[in-house]
Amino acid sequence: MTFPAFLSPDPTWDGDSTGGPLLLTVRFSASIPDFPLDIENPDITTAAGLKQLIRTHLPPNLSSHRLRLIYAGRGLEDATPLSVSLKLPPSPSRTPVVQEDATTVKGKGKAPIREQPRLYIHCSIGDIVLSDADLAAEAAIATTLQQEQADEDYTGRKKQQQPPPSTTSAPRGFDRLLSAGFTPSEVSALRSQFMAIQSVSRTPDTMPTGAELRELEDRWMDEGSSAMAAGVPGGGEGISFADDDGGFGAGSRGAMDDMLWGAVMGFFWPVGCAMWLRREEGVWSWRKGLAVFVGVVINVAFGAMRIMN
């Protein structure tokens, strides 16, 4: 019997793993007589390989139809070896068994050899005609060795297609917008507006720069101002986002504190605040300085009302 190339014994396959060929008898649902098949390597031949072998024995008008193999009432999976699908016993039990009889004992004859029983595989021929691509995919998983080779080829191609690791650092902050189609002038204008917002709640000596500014921009872009209001745990070091939303929304507590304490200081200690601001420029943020000025105005208004009355 002639076997296709993918079912012929492979030179790299260890023949000791099986005790002999697997004897099968294929029984069809259509009016086609049964025929025997001998599978040399059932440990590496899959159900798809058996289908390929069966197609060589079918009439030309049925060789491309969809086949379904059934054994013991259960369908065989295409990618599973026959030794697993058919639940074959270990290889020594598939070899011919020598039975002793009286002639052997007397030395007057040879022991008869019990032939290995054949397994019946039911083959259902469907009405759907497979395309060339489907037949090629079926042939690609005819043996487990072909599957392993295909997996190795796919892994090798995937490694070749992967770009080499870049040595340049990824852009951070608003620089990420350059890859999204923004021009450098637009990114610079956006950064200027962002710095103007930060100057409302920060003094000049606490304005973020460098990596701190990039981290602040990343957080603003990724999480929004509500995440900035959550702040960064820790002591005096790190970045605080409590006052970075301009005093509105979830982070307005810092803005309210600035306005309240600034107004109280301007109302009860106007002269001291004026001297302090004169000697140390930039000691308060713009928001706190405005609150101090409002407190001073309220103090003057109360004083004028008291004098007039």
UniProtKB/Swiss-Prot annotation:
Record flagged with keyword Glycoprotein: yes
Disruption phenotype: Impairs growth on solid media under hypoxia and leads to triazole susceptibility. Impairs virulence in a murine model of invasive pulmonary aspergillosis (IPA).
Top-level taxon of origin: Eukaryota
Gene Ontology process terms (BP): proteolysis involved in protein catabolic process
A Pfam family the protein falls into: Dsc3_C
Residues with attached carbohydrate: N61
Subcellular location: Endoplasmic reticulum membrane
Role according to the record: Component of the DSC E3 ubiquitin ligase complex which is required for the srbA transcriptional activator proteolytic cleavage to release the soluble transcription factor from the membrane in low oxygen or sterol conditions. Required for growth during hypoxia and triazole drug susceptibility, as well as for virulence in a murine model of invasive pulmonary aspergillosis (IPA).
Family: Belongs to the dsc3 family.
Protein name, as recorded: DSC E3 ubiquitin ligase complex subunit C
Organism: Aspergillus fumigatus (strain ATCC MYA-4609 / CBS 101355 / FGSC A1100 / Af293)
